[in-house]
Amino acid sequence: MGSMTKIALSIAGSEASGGAGAQTDIRTFAQLGVFGATSLTCIVSFDPHHDWSHRFVPIDPQVIHDQIEAAVAVHGHIDAVKIGMLGTPATIGVVAEALEQYRFEQVVLDPVLICKGQEPGAALDTDNALRSRVLPHATMVTPNLFETRVLSGMDEITTVEQLEEGARRIHDQGVPYVLAKAGTLFDTGTALDVFYDGSTMEVLEVPAIGHERVSGAGCTLAAAVTAEIARGASPLDAA
């Protein structure tokens, strides 16, 4: 590996089909010329017999810690970290401790707030832990429409103006950069996201490609943002 090669660390789950999670992160990093390291947090396999619900197996927190420790020790410097699915308060706790220990300069949080098939009570505990323990360490957060609504405390987000307000509210919680993703859900014929950094509110809009919702699209975008930041791009340019 050349001395100029940038390193990105994905702290995320393994998704067996390869369409999301750490597999997608590593593939996206490589496509953009960034070397990817991983710390797997859980193993997810879709259940084709029960409406594709998530069969979710968490990885022992000590093993997660050991993976992060190894990645940092081997590479010496991590240019950017992308955090995906964590899944349990225990996992969130060990990842938060690692963020406090290593003080990574660039942390992109793709806040997976719900796992299909997860019990509502467990999901709420996980969401609250993510908000209190990991969100304060993020330099950039990339919530989808549902996650933007939850993190901002808004009842609904159905317009660009409401999405902008959601981004403002998340920024006000201490996150320097927010990329709130509506994608194609506003039925504008475009993929539409909003970027906010406390002063600049930018609506990012391009023609939509296809009409079906695709698993892993959010992972791919967040991983691409992470890779571009690792390469030295500004958060807005990366978005």
Give each language-model segment a name:
Residues 2-10, 22, 26-118:
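Conserved N-terminal subdomain of the carbohydrate kinase-like
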Residues 149-150, 212-235, 239:
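Short, small-residue alpha-helix embedded
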